[in-house]
UniProtKB/Swiss-Prot annotation:
Keywords: Glutamine amidotransferase, Hydrolase, Lyase, Pyridoxal phosphate. This is Pyridoxal 5'-phosphate synthase subunit PdxT. It comes from the Bacteria. L-glutamine binds at G46, E47, S48, R105, I134, R135. The lineage of its organism: Bacteria, Bacillati, Bacillota, Clostridia, Eubacteriales. It comes from Clostridium acetobutylicum (strain ATCC 824 / DSM 792 / JCM 1419 / IAM 19013 / LMG 5710 / NBRC 13948 / NRRL B-527 / VKM B-1787 / 2291 / W). GO terms for molecular function: glutaminase activity; pyridoxal 5'-phosphate synthase (glutamine hydrolysing) activity.
């Protein structure tokens, strides 16, 4: 299975390493040609506006939408979640519009407010998983087709709808492969 990681910014190397440890074939996705070679895609963290501009300028936005709408599994972590959301609070911009959620950017504050915690995410694991939040967004609304997978302090931080998975946190920065394993079976 060829698992792509949008390789513009964010935890690219860490995602690639997790995929490799699970015997997937990691692919750095930097172009439309790379996008055509993959079976599924991870959109990592970083700065959502910058990544969105990269997708538009590289003419990847519409082909990416078409692949996702056609059923290709996709997982957005942090900024990736913002890019996949239908709506971003206090913004008229949306990018991929692949999951019926509304997100709040930097909902947990600035870089100094970043934190680590643990949570049980029953759909993923029978054990608590480490969660790393860095200037993290969270979900303020989910549509009827969306299932909340995890909440922290009453805020939704992981959700799924069909072939689309989103997390506010960064599983690639934890020493745990369970989230990546779950995505690779999606």
């Amino acid at each position: 299975m060829r698992v792509g990681v949008l390789s513009f910014q964010g935890g690219v190397v860490e995602h690639l390493e997790h995929i490799e440890k699970l015997n997937g074939k990691p692919v750095k996705v930097r172009s439309l040609e790379d996008l055509q070679k993959i079976d599924r895609l991870i959109i990592p963290g970083g700065e959502s506006t910058t990544i969105g501009k990269f997708l538009k300028q590289s003419n990847m936005l519409q082909p990416l939408r078409e692949k996702i709408y056609g059923g290709m599994p996709v997982w957005g972590t942090c900024a990736g979640m913002i890019l996949l959301a239908r709506k971003i609070e206090n913004s008229e911009v949306n990018y991929i519009n692949a999951i019926d959620i509304t997100v709040r950017r930097n909902a947990y504050g600035s870089q100094v407010d970043s934190f680590n915690t643990k949570a049980l995410i029953e759909e993923i694991s029978l054990n608590e998983m480490p969660l790393v939040f860095i200037r993290a967004p969270y979900i303020t609304r989910i549509g009827e087709t969306v299932k909340a997978l995890c909440t922290i302090d009453k805020n939704i931080v992981a959700a799924k709808s069909n072939n689309v998975l989103v997390t506010s946190f960064h599983p690639e920065l934890a020493d745990n492969l369970e989230f990546h394993e779950y995505f690779m079976k999606l």
